[in-house]
Regions:
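Extreme N-terminal cap/leader segments of soluble proteins
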Residues: 1-78, 126-138, 188, 218, ...
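Glycine-rich anion-binding loops of enzyme active sites
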Residues: 45, 66-67, 77, 85-86, ...
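Active-site pocket-shaping loop/turn-to-helix segments
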Residues: 76-84, 214-223
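Glycine/charged-rich beta-loop-alpha catalytic/anionic-binding loops adjacent to active sites
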Residues: 65-78, 106, 209-213, 259, ...
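Glycine-/charge-enriched secondary-structure boundary and capping motifs
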Residues: 2-8, 116-135, 141, 147-158, ...
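Alpha-helical scaffold segments that flank or form the walls of functional sites
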Residues: 81-97
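Alpha-helix C-terminal capping segments
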Residues: 92-100, 254-255, 301-302
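Membrane-embedded hairpin module used as a gating/binding unit in multi-pass transport
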Residues: 192-194, 199-209, 224-227
Length: 376
């Protein structure tokens, strides 16, 4: 059984149920609005949804939570990082459309009111909002103790979720990855660690060591808004933007172009990933399909824009690396030669051979993966 599924996260089942049982109903809602006159062609599975509400610009919408990282925050009684995570997870998805994040609403479900905990989360939300340049004009606290059983004592049991909105500035076209071409350059921005994904597997692998590794495990998700805006300010038009969250580097396959990616010079992975792999005997294919492995965000640019993009990102405080390139191979494969892995859809496979998936008959292109709806 897949180690991540054994840890309680069955991604394949989740994606199948979303595609067959939920998406057909949710898709129908878009035809009922009297305000929305057009919806961009972003495929279901992209990082955020773009909607056009005349007379204003296209707006980007997304929602995400912090997942079971909250259990480690509770264990360590360190809540501020998850507030930052809540903001980062959402705004990093918004910027993948080319939109500028504007605001976020937060939702906290808790078994009881603990003023110190809520203040720490609020500080984290503030810090994240400051890094992203957004407002948090409202939110909700729901006291649902009957639904959140406290089985281990200690601080409150809670869940933290955000919904973010952004807008495409005048004169800027939305980004969906359809402009990506073979020969384009993939730039990678380092992560701070796990960010907010794979914590069910990490907790299972590390067991009681999570306490001694709290500093590494609770490092907040990096916010890449300033980096993205630095590109536009420098006159660089990115052809693709990918938030490397749940699903790891396979998130590149969510870009619209039917191409593939070879990543042969990724940023170094923080030590915490090797500790998880060793402690839990987790194979490389699962590690790369679950965690970001040291890369938090990818930017795809034309060869002519590679140097200006590197300069702009460096000036914005990033440490970008030229991670690889785009190839003409159809099917949206992601190759990581150094790890001996080739991936497609939601899985990596060892040995560099073709994965046991075939593109669907309609159109010959592999379906982009459904958005990882797990920050667990």
């Amino acid at each position: 059984m897949d180690p991540y599924a054994s840890a309680g996260v069955d991604e394949e089942r989740e994606q199948d149920v979303f595609a067959t049982a939920m998406r057909p109903w949710l898709a129908r809602t878009t035809v009922r609005s009297q305000l929305v006159t057009s919806i961009t062609g972003l495929a279901s599975g992209y990082f955020a949804t773009l909607m056009h509400v005349p007379p204003g610009p296209p707006i980007a919408l997304t929602t995400d939570g912090v997942g079971t990282k909250i259990l480690l925050a509770r264990e360590a009684d360190r809540w501020e990082p998850v507030g930052i995570d809540c903001v980062a997870n959402n705004v990093n998805d918004v910027i993948c459309t080319g939109a500028v994040p504007l605001a976020l609403l937060d939702y906290i479900a808790t078994d009881r009111i603990d003023a110190a905990v809520l203040e720490a989360i609020a500080r984290g939300l503030y810090r994240g909002a400051d890094l992203a340049g957004i407002a948090i004009p409202g939110g909700e606290i729901a006291q649902i103790g009957a639904m959140l059983a406290d089985s281990a004592g200690g601080g409150p049991m809670l869940d933290l979720v955000g919904t973010a909105v952004g807008a495409i500035p005048d004169g800027r076209s939305p980004v969906d990855g359809s402009a990506v071409r073979p020969g384009d350059v993939v730039l990678a921005l380092p992560s701070s660690g796990l960010h907010s994904n794979g914590y069910s597997l990490a907790r299972r692998a590390l067991g009681p060591r999570t306490r001694e590794l709290a500093d590494a495990l609770l490092a907040p998700t990096r916010v890449y808004v300033r980096a993205a805006e630095a590109l536009w300010a420098a006159g660089v038009t990115p052809r693709g933007l990918a938030h490397i969250s749940g699903g790891g580097l396979l998130n590149l396959a969510r870009l619209a172009a039917d191409v593939s990616y070879t990543l042969d010079a990724l940023p170094p992975a923080p030590e915490i990933f090797a500790l998880i792999a060793s402690a839990g005997d987790v194979p490389a294919a699962t590690m790369y399909a679950t965690f970001n492995m040291g890369t938090g965000f990818c930017v795809v640019v034309s060869p002519a824009d590679a140097k200006p993009a590197l300069n702009a990102l460096t000036a914005a405080g990033e440490q970008p690396v030229v991670a690889g390139s785009v190839t003409a191979r159809p099917g949206r494969y992601v190759s990581i030669p150094a790890a001996g892995l080739l991936g497609q859809g939601d899985s990596f496979f060892p040995g560099g051979s073709d994965p046991p998936h075939t593109p669907p008959a309609h159109g010959g292109a592999a379906r982009p993966p459904i958005p990882p709806r797990d920050t667990v």
